[in-house]
């Protein structure tokens, strides 16, 4: 990259992108930015982008452009993987429905939680099959066990889908949501989050307020119980000092990351 673009121009660009992330220059972060830039240029060339353009070689927001290409690459790969997974998903979903009755629960809550905004939508799955398909497409942790299905069955939390309105049938982010709308987790490809999530956060907050106006007495009761369970679990995680072992957050305290990811419902005014 340095040879192709010129040493001075490349170093200046790396400093600019590092400051964009941290507000100042940081050598450790600069190394990560350099790796992202290298990955981005490799992906851009493979998808046929014009590498002679300044805007391609030196994108204004490197992280955003890098993440966009990662998401597109992942989407193409997962579509191929899913072609051979249909039968196994159906078989597994059938067993999960017998055990946890996801379809029946979601029929009761669909009108409370489904919502269309100007650019994004929240979708309530039909049942376990939809959830498994979403998890296998995005390759995140829901598919690896029954924990989240158990939580749905006792109304501790639900699994919903955050989608782009322009592409409503393609998995984007999976949300773990408490009754009432508090979002515990937001996960996309490889159990991760990307720069594009920031654009959707105002919509999530808008949706949370809409949900508050639709709450039933039973859902309010479930929301209170869920909040108490979450507080207890966070306290236990903090006391035990559980560490994340893999991924971008490896080495960090699990409870800190869960608290950072949490989007609690703001109280309605008036």
What are these regions (language model features)?
Residues 1-270:
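Glycine-focused motif/segment detector
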